[in-house]
Amino acid sequence: TPIARLLVTMGIAGGCTEFVMGGISLNLCMEYDLSFQKSVYDAQYLAFLSGWLNERGVKIAMESDNAAALGVITTPSISIVMGIIDLVIAAEQGAKYLALAYVPMHNFIQDIAGLRQQRRLTKKYLDMLGYSDVTLYQDIHQWNGAFPEDRQKANGLIASVSAIAALYGEAEQMMVKTADEGMGVPTMESNAEGLILTRQVMNIFRGQRYPNSLEVLEESKIIELEVNCMMKNILEMGDGDVLIGMVRALKAGTYEFPYAVSKHVLGRVTLMRDNTGAVRFLHTGNVPFPPEVIEYNREKVELRKKIEGREEMMMLADDLREVRAPLIFP
């Protein structure tokens, strides 16, 4: 929830050492008409509380829910930028232990590149803005979209994310899901099964790392271009203040969180998977990307259209409804 002062205060009093925050991200994902002033004030209070406790020897970590709450597809760049903004807001208030969420989209190449760039680029901007003294963590979430009701399909989803996490090898945390996720509140037994499955996959891939292939390097390059473009625009619009810049960018549509429920999102940016399952920009709206970024995304989407021979809207509907819909040729 974007308004969590009482909840977090009670949690800390009960022994909780980390909590999720997001003055911008949780507002966009979970509220239709909540003012940024209210949600950011709440996040700033929690960050100040975290910093105050840190100074007194109680280590409290804050995690940006930079993509996890959305529950649909997103590009690594959109998620990374949102995480940077959330963590800068927290660092400004004195929080020292900061975590970033990452929800794999189930394309190994894009996800490995995204995870690596998320840590590197977030550190870059925190350092640049004067917050080099923070400790940064990563938390991989096992898919926050619609879970299959079929338990075997759900287990396959959990296993695939676990494999991505294992081959990335640098995340400090993972939010484990269960095969009952698509049916309702999981039982204690179902939670235990999810943990066993995750640990088994992690053990199988123990000691292995996904190599820096040409494909990973290419994906890393495009992610960095997209992130730097959006961050440059946000900093310019805020005259160096990331919070003011983000609010102005959202109003102008030069940054968007596609498919979010908030009325503060213009809704001109749309995303779709390409033929490999990687998430691309279908429409870039008002985001000031350079021509090479727009063309790269366009080519990837057009190739899928050519191969599948289906209407764009039907493919998009599949992408939003399932993790990866079965391919049925017309």
Predicted segment positions?
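Structural signal for hydrophobic packing residues in well-ordered secondary-structure cores
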Residues: I12-G15, F19, A47-G57, K123-L126, ...
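Long alpha-helical, hydrophobic tracts
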Residues: Q37, V58-E193
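General structural feature for long, well-ordered alpha-helical segments within catalytic domains
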Residues: I3-L7, D42-L49, S79-D86, G114, ...
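Electropositive, surface-exposed helix/loop patches at the edges of structured domains
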Residues: R56-V58, L129-P148, Y210-N233
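Acidic, glycine-enriched catalytic cores built around paired aspartates
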Residues: E170-P330
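Catalytic alpha/beta active-site cores
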Residues: T1-Q93, Y97-A101, N107, V293-P330
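Residue-identity detector for glycine
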Residues: G11-G15, G22-G23, G51, G57, ...
